[in-house]
């Protein structure tokens, strides 16, 4: 399997040109265009000097200086946090001491909240992300977040409109950059912290030499601080100071012919297409008894089941209300899919969910979209995780997904080989802003960010 295609729901995502060149040198955009042309011509650009690409692994990151992140309250690359340390890096600021006025943008640009309840603005954000958001390293695939997905991810209970933070051009009012934050209580080891999740940092390709991303990060930090929240969680496909955990994507083919056609994956040596299709063929029916789509009336039971299960992990969400959980997990067609199994007494014993995040295929004549399902939260109570996840493969296949993706967090890694998942080439780093604690193994992570 290739193309780990990691989420950069994060400050300094892989294609945002944060710590790149500026001044009179060619812009990051110019250099990136050249890099893309060289890549297309088959040239290995990974060892070329002076090309400002974001580091994709820890070793590469240790040798890099981070102009922006070295100024932020995050552990630095060479820092090892002892096991008994689990606390904020900077003390909370008194609210009357938090900067009251927005940070300055370059001339010709202004701040503008994006109102996702307004169809026109929602579509503007959709178009910005569709054309400028995360691509894989070979520029073959780009995430295609639907408008419904954006509302689901950003309009969570307790969301604040000013945390949907856009930048517009004065000249034509065009939306050119965005960063989003949503409230989320997170438990880190034994401490429960009110945080925000940061997501959808995106800067228009034409603006990437203007160092807008650091200003976006500073501004969303200010807007969050004003409300008395001083910590954040986010993920990124690149390495910046300093991940609390490094997870890896795994992929399970559901439609191998299409995935091979678009070069998401390739035929293994000595394998024919017919044998590959046979290898990945799934049963028609699920194995878990009484497995059905989750309903809103199931929320109280799923709330108890999931809340208990998440206690085993060192980094996990804390649902403060059934309303929060209902928003995240009650099925929404084309966005989130959730299923429960109940016993003879009507007690829910098992639960599994996945969300839909398609990718646009760049420049393919036949296929325009890969339909990808991502494993979300689950609790295997009466059956093994292996059986429950295999059932979710069957359910995703029934919904016509092409591939089923999962990270090696929770207990996932133990079941990947049996269920024919292949290791992806993309890591997903987990980050905490203004918090330091000991590093975590992927199996300690119970927080899944879209």
UniProtKB/Swiss-Prot annotation:
Residues 1-28 are annotated as: Disordered. Adds a myristoyl group to the N-terminal glycine residue of certain cellular proteins. The gene is nmt-1. Pfam families: NMT, NMT_C. Its EC number is 2.3.1.97. One of its GO terms (cellular component) is cytosol. The keyword Acyltransferase applies. Disulfide bonds: none annotated. It catalyses: N-terminal glycyl-[protein] + tetradecanoyl-CoA = N-tetradecanoylglycyl-[protein] + CoA + H(+). The keyword Cytoplasm applies. This is Probable glycylpeptide N-tetradecanoyltransferase. PANTHER family: GLYCYLPEPTIDE N-TETRADECANOYLTRANSFERASE (PTHR11377:SF5), N-MYRISTOYL TRANSFERASE (PTHR11377).
